[in-house]
Protein backbone atom coordinates (compact mmCIF):
# COMPACT_ATOMS: atom_id res chain seq x y z
CA UNK A 1 0.00 0.00 0.00
CA UNK A 2 2.82 2.41 0.92
CA UNK A 3 4.52 1.62 -2.40
CA UNK A 4 1.32 2.42 -4.32
CA UNK A 5 0.90 5.71 -2.47
CA UNK A 6 4.50 6.69 -3.19
CA UNK A 7 4.14 5.63 -6.83
CA UNK A 8 0.97 7.70 -7.25
CA UNK A 9 2.59 10.65 -5.49
CA UNK A 10 5.65 10.47 -7.75
CA UNK A 11 3.49 10.42 -10.88
CA UNK A 12 1.46 13.40 -9.68
CA UNK A 13 4.72 15.24 -8.96
CA UNK A 14 5.99 14.37 -12.45
CA UNK A 15 2.82 15.89 -13.92
CA UNK A 16 3.31 19.02 -11.82
CA UNK A 17 6.96 19.20 -12.83
CA UNK A 18 6.01 18.90 -16.50
CA UNK A 19 3.41 21.65 -16.18
CA UNK A 20 5.88 23.91 -14.37
CA UNK A 21 8.60 23.23 -16.94
CA UNK A 22 6.14 24.01 -19.75
CA UNK A 23 5.11 27.25 -18.05
CA UNK A 24 8.77 28.21 -17.58
CA UNK A 25 9.53 27.62 -21.27
CA UNK A 26 6.40 29.56 -22.23
CA UNK A 27 7.59 32.51 -20.12
CA UNK A 28 10.99 32.40 -21.82
CA UNK A 29 9.55 32.81 -25.35
CA UNK A 30 7.22 35.76 -24.73
CA UNK A 31 9.35 38.03 -26.92
CA UNK A 32 10.11 35.43 -29.59
CA UNK A 33 7.12 35.52 -31.97
CA UNK A 34 8.08 32.48 -34.07
CA UNK A 35 8.66 30.24 -31.07
CA UNK A 36 5.49 31.55 -29.41
CA UNK A 37 3.43 30.79 -32.53
CA UNK A 38 4.90 27.29 -32.80
CA UNK A 39 4.18 26.63 -29.11
CA UNK A 40 0.58 27.83 -29.35
CA UNK A 41 -0.04 25.90 -32.56
CA UNK A 42 1.11 22.66 -30.92
CA UNK A 43 -0.70 23.29 -27.64
CA UNK A 44 -3.99 21.38 -27.12
CA UNK A 45 -6.85 23.85 -27.59
CA UNK A 46 -9.91 21.91 -26.50
CA UNK A 47 -12.98 23.25 -28.29
CA UNK A 48 -13.97 26.08 -30.60
CA UNK A 49 -17.44 26.99 -29.33
CA UNK A 50 -18.25 30.01 -31.51
CA UNK A 51 -17.73 29.23 -35.18
CA UNK A 52 -20.09 29.95 -38.10
CA UNK A 53 -20.01 27.50 -40.99
CA UNK A 54 -21.09 30.38 -43.25
CA UNK A 55 -17.86 32.23 -42.49
CA UNK A 56 -15.46 29.34 -42.09
CA UNK A 57 -14.13 28.94 -45.63
CA UNK A 58 -11.24 30.79 -47.17
CA UNK A 59 -12.33 32.68 -50.28
CA UNK A 60 -9.77 30.80 -52.38
CA UNK A 61 -11.38 27.51 -51.37
CA UNK A 62 -14.89 28.74 -52.16
CA UNK A 63 -13.77 29.70 -55.66
CA UNK A 64 -12.38 26.19 -56.03
CA UNK A 65 -15.57 24.54 -54.75
CA UNK A 66 -17.66 26.55 -57.21
CA UNK A 67 -15.42 26.05 -60.25
CA UNK A 68 -18.00 23.76 -61.93
CA UNK A 69 -21.13 25.64 -60.82
CA UNK A 70 -21.51 27.89 -63.86
CA UNK A 71 -21.69 30.98 -61.67
CA UNK A 72 -20.89 34.53 -62.68
CA UNK A 73 -19.16 37.24 -60.61
CA UNK A 74 -20.55 40.76 -60.75
CA UNK A 75 -17.82 43.11 -61.96
CA UNK A 76 -18.47 45.77 -59.31
CA UNK A 77 -20.07 44.08 -56.27
CA UNK A 78 -18.22 40.75 -56.72
CA UNK A 79 -21.40 38.88 -55.78
CA UNK A 80 -22.03 35.59 -57.57
CA UNK A 81 -25.18 34.35 -59.26
CA UNK A 82 -26.34 32.16 -62.14
CA UNK A 83 -26.04 34.09 -65.39
CA UNK A 84 -26.15 32.27 -68.71
CA UNK A 85 -24.97 35.39 -70.54
CA UNK A 86 -21.86 35.69 -68.36
CA UNK A 87 -18.72 36.35 -70.36
CA UNK A 88 -15.06 35.73 -69.49
CA UNK A 89 -13.29 36.58 -67.26
CA UNK A 90 -16.28 36.77 -64.91
CA UNK A 91 -17.16 33.08 -64.99
CA UNK A 92 -16.11 31.50 -61.68
CA UNK A 93 -14.25 28.78 -63.54
CA UNK A 94 -12.06 31.37 -65.26
CA UNK A 95 -11.45 34.09 -62.65
CA UNK A 96 -8.04 32.69 -61.74
CA UNK A 97 -6.82 33.69 -65.18
CA UNK A 98 -7.14 37.34 -64.15
CA UNK A 99 -4.74 38.10 -61.29
CA UNK A 100 -6.43 41.43 -60.51
CA UNK A 101 -10.00 40.10 -60.55
CA UNK A 102 -9.08 37.01 -58.52
CA UNK A 103 -7.58 39.13 -55.77
CA UNK A 104 -10.43 41.64 -55.86
CA UNK A 105 -12.86 38.78 -55.20
CA UNK A 106 -10.83 37.49 -52.26
CA UNK A 107 -10.70 40.98 -50.74
CA UNK A 108 -14.45 41.43 -51.27
CA UNK A 109 -15.27 38.07 -49.68
CA UNK A 110 -13.05 38.56 -46.64
CA UNK A 111 -11.34 41.14 -44.43
CA UNK A 112 -8.06 40.74 -46.31
CA UNK A 113 -6.46 44.10 -47.12
CA UNK A 114 -9.50 45.92 -45.74
CA UNK A 115 -9.00 49.63 -45.05
CA UNK A 116 -11.87 51.66 -43.57
CA UNK A 117 -13.06 54.42 -45.87
CA UNK A 118 -16.24 54.21 -47.91
CA UNK A 119 -17.38 51.40 -45.63
CA UNK A 120 -16.59 50.39 -42.06
CA UNK A 121 -15.16 47.05 -41.01
CA UNK A 122 -18.61 46.19 -39.67
CA UNK A 123 -20.34 46.92 -42.99
CA UNK A 124 -17.70 45.20 -45.11
CA UNK A 125 -17.81 42.09 -42.92
CA UNK A 126 -21.58 41.67 -42.92
CA UNK A 127 -21.76 42.33 -46.68
CA UNK A 128 -19.49 39.39 -47.52
CA UNK A 129 -21.97 36.58 -46.87
CA UNK A 130 -24.56 37.58 -49.47
CA UNK A 131 -21.81 37.76 -52.09
CA UNK A 132 -20.95 34.07 -51.92
CA UNK A 133 -24.29 32.73 -50.60
CA UNK A 134 -24.98 30.53 -53.67
CA UNK A 135 -21.67 28.76 -53.03
CA UNK A 136 -22.45 28.26 -49.34
CA UNK A 137 -25.86 26.77 -50.13
CA UNK A 138 -24.41 24.21 -52.53
CA UNK A 139 -21.09 23.38 -50.87
CA UNK A 140 -21.73 23.03 -47.14
CA UNK A 141 -20.23 19.53 -47.13
CA UNK A 142 -16.92 20.77 -48.54
CA UNK A 143 -16.92 23.69 -46.10
CA UNK A 144 -17.53 21.29 -43.22
CA UNK A 145 -14.58 19.21 -44.36
CA UNK A 146 -12.43 22.34 -44.49
CA UNK A 147 -13.50 23.43 -41.00
CA UNK A 148 -12.92 20.01 -39.46
CA UNK A 149 -9.54 19.43 -41.06
CA UNK A 150 -8.31 22.90 -40.07
CA UNK A 151 -9.45 22.32 -36.49
CA UNK A 152 -7.72 18.95 -36.38
CA UNK A 153 -4.46 20.42 -37.64
CA UNK A 154 -4.66 23.04 -34.87
CA UNK A 155 -5.02 20.41 -32.15
CA UNK A 156 -8.67 21.22 -31.55
CA UNK A 157 -10.58 18.35 -29.96
CA UNK A 158 -14.15 19.58 -30.35
CA UNK A 159 -16.04 21.89 -32.70
CA UNK A 160 -19.51 23.40 -32.29
CA UNK A 161 -20.55 24.79 -35.65
CA UNK A 162 -23.45 27.18 -36.21
CA UNK A 163 -25.39 26.06 -39.27
CA UNK A 164 -28.77 26.32 -41.04
CA UNK A 165 -28.96 23.35 -43.42
CA UNK A 166 -32.58 24.00 -44.44
CA UNK A 167 -31.73 27.30 -46.17
CA UNK A 168 -34.29 29.09 -43.99
CA UNK A 169 -37.23 26.90 -45.00
CA UNK A 170 -38.32 27.25 -41.39
CA UNK A 171 -38.41 31.03 -41.76
CA UNK A 172 -40.33 30.76 -45.02
CA UNK A 173 -42.86 28.58 -43.24
CA UNK A 174 -43.24 31.24 -40.56
CA UNK A 175 -43.94 33.89 -43.18
CA UNK A 176 -47.18 32.08 -44.05
CA UNK A 177 -48.63 32.85 -40.61
CA UNK A 178 -49.88 36.07 -39.08
CA UNK A 179 -48.17 37.14 -35.87
CA UNK A 180 -49.83 35.83 -32.71
CA UNK A 181 -48.49 37.23 -29.45
CA UNK A 182 -49.82 34.11 -27.74
CA UNK A 183 -46.70 32.00 -28.35
CA UNK A 184 -48.45 28.83 -27.21
CA UNK A 185 -51.05 29.21 -29.96
CA UNK A 186 -48.44 30.14 -32.56
CA UNK A 187 -46.35 27.10 -31.69
CA UNK A 188 -49.37 24.81 -32.02
CA UNK A 189 -50.18 26.23 -35.46
CA UNK A 190 -46.61 25.74 -36.67
CA UNK A 191 -46.39 22.20 -35.33
CA UNK A 192 -49.62 21.32 -37.15
CA UNK A 193 -48.04 22.69 -40.32
CA UNK A 194 -44.61 21.65 -41.65
CA UNK A 195 -42.11 22.19 -38.82
CA UNK A 196 -41.53 18.49 -38.12
CA UNK A 197 -40.99 17.57 -41.81
CA UNK A 198 -38.42 20.38 -41.99
CA UNK A 199 -36.73 19.01 -38.86
CA UNK A 200 -36.61 15.48 -40.30
CA UNK A 201 -35.21 16.78 -43.57
CA UNK A 202 -32.45 18.65 -41.71
CA UNK A 203 -31.45 15.40 -40.00
CA UNK A 204 -31.19 13.79 -43.44
CA UNK A 205 -28.89 16.65 -44.46
CA UNK A 206 -26.67 15.89 -41.48
CA UNK A 207 -26.59 12.25 -42.59
CA UNK A 208 -25.22 13.41 -45.95
CA UNK A 209 -22.61 15.64 -44.31
CA UNK A 210 -21.56 12.75 -42.08
CA UNK A 211 -21.02 10.47 -45.08
CA UNK A 212 -18.94 13.17 -46.76
CA UNK A 213 -16.79 13.62 -43.64
CA UNK A 214 -16.36 9.89 -43.12
CA UNK A 215 -13.78 9.71 -45.90
CA UNK A 216 -11.63 12.18 -43.96
CA UNK A 217 -12.08 10.44 -40.60
CA UNK A 218 -11.31 7.05 -42.16
CA UNK A 219 -8.28 8.53 -43.93
CA UNK A 220 -5.97 11.31 -42.70
CA UNK A 221 -8.22 12.12 -39.74
CA UNK A 222 -7.66 8.66 -38.30
CA UNK A 223 -4.11 9.62 -37.40
CA UNK A 224 -4.55 13.38 -37.22
CA UNK A 225 -7.46 13.58 -34.75
CA UNK A 226 -8.88 10.18 -33.75
CA UNK A 227 -10.72 11.67 -30.76
CA UNK A 228 -12.29 14.65 -32.56
CA UNK A 229 -15.98 15.43 -32.01
CA UNK A 230 -18.21 17.64 -34.19
CA UNK A 231 -21.57 18.98 -33.04
CA UNK A 232 -23.93 21.64 -34.39
CA UNK A 233 -25.91 24.64 -33.20
CA UNK A 234 -28.98 25.45 -35.28
CA UNK A 235 -28.68 29.11 -36.19
CA UNK A 236 -31.67 31.44 -36.39
CA UNK A 237 -31.69 34.57 -38.56
CA UNK A 238 -32.65 37.41 -36.21
CA UNK A 239 -33.07 40.07 -38.93
CA UNK A 240 -36.48 38.73 -39.93
CA UNK A 241 -40.08 39.45 -38.86
CA UNK A 242 -41.28 37.86 -35.60
CA UNK A 243 -43.26 34.93 -37.06
CA UNK A 244 -40.24 33.88 -39.12
CA UNK A 245 -37.87 34.14 -36.17
CA UNK A 246 -40.23 32.13 -33.97
CA UNK A 247 -40.67 29.43 -36.64
CA UNK A 248 -36.90 29.13 -36.94
CA UNK A 249 -36.49 28.96 -33.16
CA UNK A 250 -39.17 26.29 -32.87
CA UNK A 251 -37.44 24.29 -35.61
CA UNK A 252 -34.13 24.60 -33.78
CA UNK A 253 -35.54 23.50 -30.42
CA UNK A 254 -37.40 20.57 -31.99
CA UNK A 255 -34.28 19.56 -33.94
CA UNK A 256 -31.97 19.73 -30.91
CA UNK A 257 -34.44 17.68 -28.86
CA UNK A 258 -34.53 14.94 -31.53
CA UNK A 259 -31.08 14.79 -33.15
CA UNK A 260 -28.09 14.34 -30.78
CA UNK A 261 -25.76 15.89 -33.35
CA UNK A 262 -27.49 19.23 -32.72
CA UNK A 263 -26.68 20.37 -29.19
CA UNK A 264 -28.35 23.79 -29.09
CA UNK A 265 -29.45 26.96 -30.86
CA UNK A 266 -28.08 30.44 -31.52
CA UNK A 267 -29.23 33.71 -33.08
CA UNK A 268 -27.11 35.16 -35.90
CA UNK A 269 -26.93 38.22 -38.17
CA UNK A 270 -26.01 41.74 -37.09
CA UNK A 271 -27.25 42.48 -33.58
CA UNK A 272 -27.47 46.17 -34.51
CA UNK A 273 -29.77 45.46 -37.47
CA UNK A 274 -33.10 47.24 -37.69
CA UNK A 275 -35.26 44.23 -36.80
CA UNK A 276 -32.73 42.82 -34.35
CA UNK A 277 -32.86 46.03 -32.33
CA UNK A 278 -36.60 46.58 -32.67
CA UNK A 279 -37.53 43.03 -31.68
CA UNK A 280 -34.69 42.17 -29.30
CA UNK A 281 -36.83 41.87 -26.15
CA UNK A 282 -39.48 39.93 -28.07
CA UNK A 283 -36.88 37.52 -29.44
CA UNK A 284 -35.51 36.90 -25.94
CA UNK A 285 -39.07 36.22 -24.77
CA UNK A 286 -39.47 33.69 -27.59
CA UNK A 287 -36.29 31.86 -26.57
CA UNK A 288 -37.33 31.90 -22.92
CA UNK A 289 -40.76 30.50 -23.79
CA UNK A 290 -39.26 27.62 -25.77
CA UNK A 291 -36.66 27.00 -23.07
CA UNK A 292 -39.47 26.21 -20.64
CA UNK A 293 -40.89 23.64 -23.07
CA UNK A 294 -37.53 22.17 -24.10
CA UNK A 295 -35.38 22.60 -20.96
CA UNK A 296 -32.67 20.20 -22.12
CA UNK A 297 -31.88 22.18 -25.29
CA UNK A 298 -28.83 24.37 -24.71
CA UNK A 299 -28.79 28.05 -25.64
CA UNK A 300 -25.89 30.22 -26.78
CA UNK A 301 -26.74 33.76 -27.83
CA UNK A 302 -24.91 36.54 -29.60
CA UNK A 303 -25.42 39.40 -27.14
CA UNK A 304 -23.57 42.65 -26.65
CA UNK A 305 -21.81 42.61 -30.05
CA UNK A 306 -22.35 46.37 -29.98
CA UNK A 307 -20.41 49.58 -29.33
CA UNK A 308 -21.36 53.25 -28.84
CA UNK A 309 -22.11 54.89 -32.17
CA UNK A 310 -23.18 51.67 -33.82
CA UNK A 311 -26.48 51.97 -31.93
CA UNK A 312 -27.87 54.56 -29.53
CA UNK A 313 -26.63 54.43 -25.94
CA UNK A 314 -30.03 53.11 -24.83
CA UNK A 315 -29.47 50.07 -27.05
CA UNK A 316 -26.37 49.12 -25.06
CA UNK A 317 -28.10 48.84 -21.71
CA UNK A 318 -29.95 45.52 -21.70
CA UNK A 319 -29.01 42.97 -24.38
CA UNK A 320 -26.74 40.77 -22.28
CA UNK A 321 -29.04 40.89 -19.26
CA UNK A 322 -32.09 39.93 -21.34
CA UNK A 323 -30.15 37.03 -22.87
CA UNK A 324 -29.18 35.81 -19.40
CA UNK A 325 -32.37 36.45 -17.44
CA UNK A 326 -35.17 36.21 -20.00
CA UNK A 327 -33.80 33.81 -22.63
CA UNK A 328 -31.86 31.72 -20.07
CA UNK A 329 -28.72 31.58 -22.20
CA UNK A 330 -26.13 29.02 -21.10
CA UNK A 331 -23.41 30.97 -22.92
CA UNK A 332 -23.00 34.46 -24.34
CA UNK A 333 -21.23 35.18 -27.62
CA UNK A 334 -19.08 38.35 -27.71
CA UNK A 335 -20.48 40.32 -24.75
CA UNK A 336 -18.44 43.35 -25.82
CA UNK A 337 -20.75 46.05 -24.44
CA UNK A 338 -20.96 44.63 -20.89
CA UNK A 339 -19.68 47.85 -19.28
CA UNK A 340 -22.63 49.80 -20.72
CA UNK A 341 -25.26 47.44 -19.30
CA UNK A 342 -27.49 48.74 -16.52
CA UNK A 343 -26.04 47.61 -13.17
CA UNK A 344 -23.09 46.03 -14.98
CA UNK A 345 -21.27 44.91 -11.84
CA UNK A 346 -24.35 43.09 -10.55
CA UNK A 347 -24.77 41.43 -13.96
CA UNK A 348 -21.13 40.31 -14.01
CA UNK A 349 -21.56 38.82 -10.54
CA UNK A 350 -24.72 37.06 -11.68
CA UNK A 351 -22.97 35.60 -14.73
CA UNK A 352 -20.13 34.37 -12.52
CA UNK A 353 -22.57 32.83 -10.05
CA UNK A 354 -24.59 31.12 -12.80
CA UNK A 355 -21.38 30.06 -14.58
CA UNK A 356 -22.43 31.61 -17.89
CA UNK A 357 -19.41 31.44 -20.15
CA UNK A 358 -18.58 34.25 -22.59
CA UNK A 359 -17.23 33.20 -25.98
CA UNK A 360 -14.43 35.70 -26.65
CA UNK A 361 -13.69 36.49 -30.31
CA UNK A 362 -10.69 38.83 -30.32
CA UNK A 363 -9.96 39.05 -34.06
CA UNK A 364 -13.64 39.45 -34.84
CA UNK A 365 -14.17 42.24 -32.31
CA UNK A 366 -11.13 44.12 -33.62
CA UNK A 367 -12.18 43.83 -37.27
CA UNK A 368 -15.93 44.42 -36.94
CA UNK A 369 -16.29 46.65 -33.87
CA UNK A 370 -12.80 48.18 -33.76
CA UNK A 371 -12.48 46.98 -30.16
CA UNK A 372 -9.12 45.58 -29.10
CA UNK A 373 -6.39 45.91 -26.48
CA UNK A 374 -7.48 47.52 -23.23
CA UNK A 375 -10.82 48.55 -24.76
CA UNK A 376 -11.87 44.90 -24.84
CA UNK A 377 -13.77 43.58 -21.79
CA UNK A 378 -11.85 40.29 -21.60
CA UNK A 379 -9.97 41.42 -18.47
CA UNK A 380 -13.19 42.74 -16.94
CA UNK A 381 -14.77 39.32 -17.26
CA UNK A 382 -11.66 37.77 -15.71
CA UNK A 383 -11.75 40.29 -12.86
CA UNK A 384 -15.29 39.23 -11.93
CA UNK A 385 -14.57 35.51 -12.41
CA UNK A 386 -16.94 35.13 -15.35
CA UNK A 387 -15.76 32.05 -17.27
CA UNK A 388 -14.43 32.71 -20.77
CA UNK A 389 -13.13 30.70 -23.72
CA UNK A 390 -11.42 31.85 -26.90
CA UNK A 391 -13.10 31.20 -30.25
CA UNK A 392 -12.75 32.15 -33.92
CA UNK A 393 -16.22 33.38 -35.03
CA UNK A 394 -15.74 33.45 -38.84
CA UNK A 395 -12.18 32.30 -39.41
CA UNK A 396 -12.37 32.25 -43.22
CA UNK A 397 -13.80 35.75 -43.63
CA UNK A 398 -11.52 37.08 -40.88
CA UNK A 399 -8.46 35.21 -42.25
CA UNK A 400 -7.58 33.91 -38.80
CA UNK A 401 -7.57 30.72 -36.72
CA UNK A 402 -7.74 29.60 -33.11
CA UNK A 403 -3.97 29.72 -32.64
CA UNK A 404 -4.07 33.41 -33.50
CA UNK A 405 -6.71 34.03 -30.83
CA UNK A 406 -4.43 32.51 -28.19
CA UNK A 407 -1.52 34.56 -29.48
CA UNK A 408 -3.55 37.78 -29.18
CA UNK A 409 -4.47 36.84 -25.61
CA UNK A 410 -0.79 36.37 -24.76
CA UNK A 411 0.56 39.44 -26.57
CA UNK A 412 -2.20 41.88 -25.58
CA UNK A 413 -3.15 40.61 -22.13
CA UNK A 414 -0.05 38.70 -21.00
CA UNK A 415 -1.99 35.55 -20.18
CA UNK A 416 0.16 32.91 -18.51
CA UNK A 417 0.39 29.30 -19.63
CA UNK A 418 -1.79 28.22 -16.71
CA UNK A 419 -4.41 30.81 -17.68
CA UNK A 420 -4.43 29.53 -21.27
CA UNK A 421 -4.77 26.00 -19.96
CA UNK A 422 -7.79 27.06 -17.91
CA UNK A 423 -9.42 28.63 -20.98
CA UNK A 424 -8.82 25.43 -22.95
CA UNK A 425 -10.41 23.34 -20.21
CA UNK A 426 -13.30 25.83 -20.08
CA UNK A 427 -14.01 25.17 -23.76
CA UNK A 428 -14.91 21.55 -23.00
CA UNK A 429 -16.38 22.06 -19.51
CA UNK A 430 -18.84 24.68 -20.86
CA UNK A 431 -19.41 22.95 -24.18
CA UNK A 432 -22.85 21.57 -24.93
CA UNK A 433 -21.58 18.00 -25.09
CA UNK A 434 -23.97 15.84 -23.05
CA UNK A 435 -23.11 14.06 -19.84
CA UNK A 436 -21.54 14.71 -16.47
CA UNK A 437 -18.22 16.50 -16.17
CA UNK A 438 -14.93 14.82 -15.31
CA UNK A 439 -14.46 17.66 -12.81
CA UNK A 440 -16.45 18.39 -9.67
CA UNK A 441 -15.46 22.07 -9.82
CA UNK A 442 -14.86 24.71 -12.49
CA UNK A 443 -11.30 25.30 -11.24
CA UNK A 444 -10.21 21.81 -12.29
CA UNK A 445 -8.84 20.85 -8.90
CA UNK A 446 -11.18 18.00 -7.98
CA UNK A 447 -11.96 15.24 -10.49
CA UNK A 448 -14.90 12.92 -9.86
CA UNK A 449 -14.04 10.20 -7.35
CA UNK A 450 -14.21 7.40 -9.93
CA UNK A 451 -11.45 8.99 -12.03
CA UNK A 452 -9.30 10.66 -9.38
CA UNK A 453 -6.74 7.85 -9.24
CA UNK A 454 -6.76 7.48 -13.02
CA UNK A 455 -5.87 11.14 -13.53
CA UNK A 456 -3.03 10.96 -11.00
CA UNK A 457 -1.58 7.69 -12.36
CA UNK A 458 -2.29 8.26 -16.03
CA UNK A 459 -3.82 4.78 -16.23
CA UNK A 460 -7.52 4.36 -16.92
CA UNK A 461 -9.19 2.24 -14.23
CA UNK A 462 -12.21 0.09 -15.01
CA UNK A 463 -14.38 2.29 -12.78
CA UNK A 464 -13.28 5.47 -14.57
CA UNK A 465 -13.62 3.79 -17.96
CA UNK A 466 -17.23 2.93 -17.16
CA UNK A 467 -17.90 6.51 -16.07
CA UNK A 468 -16.41 7.95 -19.26
CA UNK A 469 -18.59 5.61 -21.31
CA UNK A 470 -21.67 7.32 -19.85
CA UNK A 471 -20.60 10.89 -20.69
CA UNK A 472 -19.40 12.38 -23.97
CA UNK A 473 -18.26 15.48 -22.10
CA UNK A 474 -16.19 13.59 -19.53
CA UNK A 475 -14.71 11.45 -22.29
CA UNK A 476 -13.51 14.55 -24.18
CA UNK A 477 -12.19 16.06 -20.93
CA UNK A 478 -10.20 12.89 -20.27
CA UNK A 479 -8.81 12.98 -23.82
CA UNK A 480 -7.85 16.64 -23.30
CA UNK A 481 -5.95 15.83 -20.11
CA UNK A 482 -4.07 13.10 -21.97
CA UNK A 483 -3.20 15.60 -24.71
CA UNK A 484 -1.82 18.01 -22.11
CA UNK A 485 0.27 15.23 -20.53
CA UNK A 486 1.80 14.38 -23.92
CA UNK A 487 2.32 18.05 -24.78
CA UNK A 488 3.99 19.01 -21.49
CA UNK A 489 6.23 16.00 -20.89
CA UNK A 490 9.01 16.96 -23.36
CA UNK A 491 9.52 20.35 -21.67
CA UNK A 492 11.14 18.63 -18.68
CA UNK A 493 14.13 17.83 -20.91
CA UNK A 494 17.19 20.08 -20.38
CA UNK A 495 17.30 21.54 -23.93
CA UNK A 496 14.09 23.48 -23.22
CA UNK A 497 15.77 25.46 -20.43
Model-derived segments and spans:
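Metal-cofactor-binding active-site regions of metalloenzymes
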Residues: 15-497
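Bacterial N-terminal signal peptides
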Residues: 1-8
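Sec/Tat signal peptide C-region and signal peptidase I cleavage site
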Residues: 10-14
